Amino acid sequence: MFLVNSFLKGGGGGGGGGGLGGGLGNVLGGLISGAAGGGGGGGGGGGMGLGGGGGGGGTAMRILGGVISAISEAAAQYNPEPPPPRSHYSNIEANESEEERQFRKLFVQLAGDDMEVSATELMNILNKVVTRHPDLKTDGFGIDTCRSMVAVMDSDTTGKLGFEEFKYLWNNIKKWQGIYKRFDTDRSGTIGSNELPGAFEAAGFHLNQHIYSMIIRRYSDETGNMDFDNFISCLVRLDAMFRAFRSLDKNGTGQIQVNIQEWLQLTMYS
C-alpha cells in the first residue's frame, strides 16, 4: 500500500569511494540522463473537501481553507499509481533488462547488509549523480529533502527504502528530471516562475495561481527561479499529499474527514 495505510493503523553511505562510487555514478548517471521528458497522467473524479474539526475564522484558517480548496480542485485531475509492493532483492523479474540487473547489483552494494537505503545513503547517491549533470543548477540534495523522499515511499515505515521502493522513486526522479530540462526553455539551469505551471502540469499537477504563488515563495529563490533539488522536493511533497488524500477517500466521494491526530500523522511523515 502507501504511507497512509500505516497512518490509519496508528503509525505514524552510498557516497563512499572505491569501485562502487565510480560504477554507481556511471550507471545511475546513465539512468537519469535517459529520461528525455514526459509527464504524469491526468484523469480522475470530482472535487473534494476536508471535513472534521471546528474552529473560528482568522488568517490561518482562511489560508488553510484556500490551500485545501486548491488541492481539492487539483487532486481530481491527478491519479498516481501506488508504489509497488516491497519484495526481496533476490526475486529478479524474468524480463529485467541488463541495465536493471546492473542497477539491482549496485543497489545491493549501496544498501548494505540490511538491503535498505537510508535517507543519508539516498542523499549521497543523488548528489553523486547530479554532479555529472552540470546543466542542472542545484546546491545538492539536503538531508531533509531525502528524508521526505524516503517517507513518501516508505510503505512499511521502517525509515528506509527497499529495492522496489528505491527503483520506483528513481523512476519518478528520472521522469521529473526530463520535465525539468524540457521546461528550462532558456537553458538557465533553473525553472522560472513563468515556466513553472507548464512543468507541473506535465508532471500531472494542475494547480491554481494561488498555490503556484505559495510554491514559488517556499521553493524558489528571491528572483522566482527554482533549482533542480527544490523542484524534486516540491514534486515529492505534492505527490505525497495527493496519494494520501486518495488513500483516505476510500469511497471515491471526493471528501475526507480526519481528526487532529490523523492530520498530524499524515502531515508530519512526508
Curated annotation (Swiss-Prot):
<keyword id="KW-0677">Repeat</keyword>
<keyword id="KW-0597">Phosphoprotein</keyword>
<feature type="binding site">
    <location>
        <position position="184"/>
    </location>
    <ligand>
        <name>Ca(2+) 3</name>
    </ligand>
</feature>
<dbReference type="InterPro" id="IPR002048">
    <property type="entry name" value="EF_hand_dom"/>
</dbReference>
<feature type="binding site">
    <location>
        <position position="188"/>
    </location>
    <ligand>
        <name>Ca(2+) 3</name>
    </ligand>
</feature>
<dbReference type="GO" id="GO:0004198">
    <property type="term" value="F:calcium-dependent cysteine-type endopeptidase activity"/>
</dbReference>
<feature type="binding site">
    <location>
        <position position="139"/>
    </location>
    <ligand>
        <name>Ca(2+) 4</name>
    </ligand>
</feature>
<feature type="binding site">
    <location>
        <position position="190"/>
    </location>
    <ligand>
        <name>Ca(2+) 3</name>
    </ligand>
</feature>
<dbReference type="GO" id="GO:0005886">
    <property type="term" value="C:plasma membrane"/>
</dbReference>
<keyword id="KW-0007">Acetylation</keyword>
<dbReference type="GO" id="GO:0044877">
    <property type="term" value="F:protein-containing complex binding"/>
</dbReference>
<feature type="domain" description="EF-hand 4">
    <location>
        <begin position="207"/>
        <end position="235"/>
    </location>
</feature>
<keyword id="KW-0106">Calcium</keyword>
<feature type="binding site">
    <location>
        <position position="121"/>
    </location>
    <ligand>
        <name>Ca(2+) 1</name>
    </ligand>
</feature>
<feature type="binding site">
    <location>
        <position position="156"/>
    </location>
    <ligand>
        <name>Ca(2+) 2</name>
    </ligand>
</feature>
<feature type="binding site">
    <location>
        <position position="111"/>
    </location>
    <ligand>
        <name>Ca(2+) 1</name>
    </ligand>
</feature>
<feature type="binding site">
    <location>
        <position position="116"/>
    </location>
    <ligand>
        <name>Ca(2+) 1</name>
    </ligand>
</feature>
<dbReference type="GO" id="GO:0006508">
    <property type="term" value="P:proteolysis"/>
</dbReference>
<feature type="binding site">
    <location>
        <position position="186"/>
    </location>
    <ligand>
        <name>Ca(2+) 3</name>
    </ligand>
</feature>
<keyword id="KW-0472">Membrane</keyword>
<comment type="subunit">
    <text>Homodimer or heterodimer of a large (catalytic) and a small (regulatory) subunit. In presence of calcium, the heterodimer dissociates.</text>
</comment>
<dbReference type="InterPro" id="IPR018247">
    <property type="entry name" value="EF_Hand_1_Ca_BS"/>
</dbReference>
<dbReference type="InterPro" id="IPR011992">
    <property type="entry name" value="EF-hand-dom_pair"/>
</dbReference>
<feature type="binding site">
    <location>
        <position position="165"/>
    </location>
    <ligand>
        <name>Ca(2+) 2</name>
    </ligand>
</feature>
<feature type="binding site">
    <location>
        <position position="154"/>
    </location>
    <ligand>
        <name>Ca(2+) 2</name>
    </ligand>
</feature>
<dbReference type="GO" id="GO:0005509">
    <property type="term" value="F:calcium ion binding"/>
</dbReference>
<feature type="binding site">
    <location>
        <position position="195"/>
    </location>
    <ligand>
        <name>Ca(2+) 3</name>
    </ligand>
</feature>
<dbReference type="GO" id="GO:0005829">
    <property type="term" value="C:cytosol"/>
</dbReference>
<feature type="domain" description="EF-hand 2">
    <location>
        <begin position="141"/>
        <end position="174"/>
    </location>
</feature>
<feature type="binding site">
    <location>
        <position position="114"/>
    </location>
    <ligand>
        <name>Ca(2+) 1</name>
    </ligand>
</feature>
<feature type="binding site">
    <location>
        <position position="227"/>
    </location>
    <ligand>
        <name>Ca(2+) 4</name>
    </ligand>
</feature>
<feature type="modified residue" description="N-acetylmethionine">
    <location>
        <position position="1"/>
    </location>
</feature>
<keyword id="KW-1003">Cell membrane</keyword>
<protein>
    <recommendedName>
        <fullName>Calpain small subunit 1</fullName>
    </recommendedName>
</protein>
<keyword id="KW-0963">Cytoplasm</keyword>
<feature type="binding site">
    <location>
        <position position="160"/>
    </location>
    <ligand>
        <name>Ca(2+) 2</name>
    </ligand>
</feature>
<feature type="domain" description="EF-hand 1; atypical">
    <location>
        <begin position="98"/>
        <end position="132"/>
    </location>
</feature>
<feature type="modified residue" description="Phosphoserine">
    <location>
        <position position="6"/>
    </location>
</feature>
<feature type="domain" description="EF-hand 3">
    <location>
        <begin position="171"/>
        <end position="206"/>
    </location>
</feature>
<dbReference type="GO" id="GO:0016020">
    <property type="term" value="C:membrane"/>
</dbReference>
<dbReference type="GO" id="GO:0005737">
    <property type="term" value="C:cytoplasm"/>
</dbReference>
<dbReference type="GO" id="GO:0110158">
    <property type="term" value="C:calpain complex"/>
</dbReference>
